[in-house]
Amino acid sequence: FIEDYTSTQASGYAFGYVNKIKLKEIYGDNVVIVTAHYGKDDPMPAKEYSEYIKEIGMRYFPNTDIDRTYRELYPYIGSYDGEYLIYSYVDDFDKAKEQMSVATVDVSGKLSEDNNTVDVEAKVKFEFSGEKNNYALFYVLTEDGMQDDSWVQENDMYEFDGYGLEEEEPLFEPFIKASEKMTGLVYDDVIVASQGAITGIEGSISPTINIDEIQTNKISFNLSDYPIIQDKKKLNAYA
């Protein structure tokens, strides 16, 4: 589970954009990526997630966390600190995947017939038994295809024009060949709503845990509470 933090004011936005494409190409359905926008001039921040970003003291954008365990990894580059621009984020992701998972979470979401509500159900199956009171679920809704002609994206990749970087990584080319301020971009995986992002939802996980026993939790999102949503048909639910 990757939380991708960005902003229309983040001049390194291209690194997060390209990183997401490459991760999806490599891992397919085995990776979940949600993108949290942040900043007073960004048109896409979700209120609760902005509060969460403040809570954790995020220092720069773009940025990522993996499973809320591997913190502040720069997208595309990851923890690599060498002098060359190398796609090494996969090394960090593979390291995170090697850690034994304590549970699996299956999530389903359904948009109501009147398009006003999304009902979400999470089924959690733990890999151990015991008494633990430190687990809780949080939920996010993301939207794909968000765009507006008035949105302006800061971009510093234009400074690499003439260095041949696009030959090494073709996905950077649209940004290298663009100007310092870009318009017409389409934003996917954007967090438009969340519940419990900061501390989890109290009571969503029973402290009495039995191996292979499925715990079920349900919540609803009233979409009128989230005005940044553009197209209710392009929403995805995660927990």
Which functions belong to the PLM regions below?
Residues 32-239:
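Short, conserved sequence motifs used for protein processing/export or organelle targeting and
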